[in-house]
Amino acid sequence: MLHTLTRSLRENKGPALVTVLLSALEVVFEIVIPLFMSNLIDFGIEGGSMAAVWKFGAFLLLLAAFQLATGVLAARIAARASVGFAANLREDMFDNVQTFAFSNIDKFSTASIVTRLTTDTTNVQNAFQMLMRMAIRAPVMLIFSMIVSFRISHDISMTFLIILPILALALFFIIRSVFPVFSRVFRTYDELNNVVQENVRGIRVVKSFNQEQHEIGKFGAISERIYKDFSKGERLITLNAPLMQFCIYTCMIVISWLGAKAIIASGNDPALGLTTGNLTALITYTMQILSSLMMLSMVFAMLTISLSSARRIAEVLEEQSDIPQPEQPVMTVRDGAVDFDHVSFVYASKADKKVLDDIDLHIRSGETIGIIGGTGASKSSLVQLIPRLYDVTGGKLTLGGVDVRDYDLDTLRGAVAMVLQKNELFSGTIAENLLWGNENATDEQLRHACELACADGFISAMPDGYDTHIEQGGTNVSGGQKQRLCIARALLKKPKVLILDDSTSAVDTRTDAQIQQALSTYIPDTTKIIIAQRISSVQNADRIVVLDDGHIDAVGCHDELLRTCEIYREVYESQQKGGEDDA
């Protein structure tokens, strides 16, 4: 995990190292200051020498200025390095998500990925910034303050050896108790984000069914769980502060008492024992030792909170796409011939059940294939294998005579245009959305593609035409308009294979027929695979495939299937009857 995260440091390694060095230098100045303060008291104030006061006072001011300068500089560089590190983490996670196959995406919910890109990354950023500063300052200050303290008075400094184990033990139990609590908190954040996303995305459904209070209750229940767990974790962490304060004041009292006895015994003579200046330095070092322990406890507390976040980020960064690039990829797709050679497929999450079994289907280049089947017949699963959104788990699938696993992924997906069941438009103008199909398309090409998809009419009727702004998710266009825009976008790719996955379900039958006629007339060399619920959408196809529970039940033209396929005939008759009833 650590190696995975540190790869994202990149250009921030230098600033991080400089921060560490500056923090160490800051501690050196801080350690030296009490020694000069001791000399100022012993030789200046107690010795009655103003020259010594001026001399050591000047050194103290100079050291304090250097300490301030190094501290401020270290803090600024640490902030810049931590922000850069967080930016790299987000970029690396987002880039890796773009390489995921659908099977990889299935492992992470959308809300979980959003949480990892935001909350988890911020937690790691804060921990990294604290690590660069406190994780260096605290141990260096602790070690050197202990060394100097023992040099001043071995006997009095033994007090630390009693206090330190108590603090270490308490800190161990606090961290061990806190870690599982915060791990649970960040998992619950995923649930909370998921509820928010679902509610915002489906707000029209929520309002139409009067389910606002139900959604508020669902959100409140998860929010309450986060509140309780976070409160529990914070309560455990806050035990650290009073414990540290108790130890600090106990040490101060014990050291002051022992120091006073030693000064009285020595007569404040440095040759005979402890002096007032030594005791002042010792008390200052005591504060430094205990404050360094407090800093360490804060570091451990922050690391405890961020460790869960770091692991969740590492999970995304370490996830390897289930669709690997071939070592020597084929860079050209010859034509749109698609051959399923006894193909089978299972989803990783449901490995015990075959979604597709022994699919043997051979599609000629330029042929129009219709696919009909009931819900759960695996129609979408079948066509998603062609652009390698998933890989076959048995048999062989070829495009243009080449196994799809041998193609360069960009080449393969560039040759296959797919309009999915869930059509997605992005924030921007209509033209910008269409250019996803071909970023170099001219205005004439955009208009021609929209004419084929029967979209040019409603676009031209809009006040801003092709410059009309599309809201997030395409909420300001109807379902049928969205489908036609997505078909036009796919046509701009000029693909070898065009897949329409129930992509005209929201348009009327007349418009559907116009789209099918346009596709047949204007792109005859493109292989067209049309999944539909309405038989009218596919009845003019060269061949129609009837899928039933992941198996091919029948293949043939419309008239042939009416005679030989019971499933097809039942669907056709029910739709015909439904059409008559509607009439």
Description of each model-found segment:
Residues 97, 219, 313, 340-342:
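Conserved catalytic Walker-motif region of ABC-type ATPase nucleotide-binding domains
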Residues 11, 15-27, 59-60, 69, ...:
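Transmembrane helices of ABC transporter permease
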Residues 331-583:
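ABC-type nucleotide-binding domain
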Residues 21-22, 29-42, 63-110, 114, ...:
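Juxtamembrane helix-loop junctions of ABC transporter transmembrane domains
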Residues 49-53, 58, 148-162, 232-312, ...:
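Helix-loop-helix
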Residues 93, 97, 206, 313, ...:
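Helix-loop junctions and hydrophobic alpha-helical segments within the transmembrane domains
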Residues 11-13, 99-103, 119-132, 136, ...:
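An intracellular "coupling" helix at the cytosolic face of ABC transporter transmembrane type-1 domains
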Residues 1-30, 37, 45-56, 66, ...:
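Membrane-integrated ABC transporters
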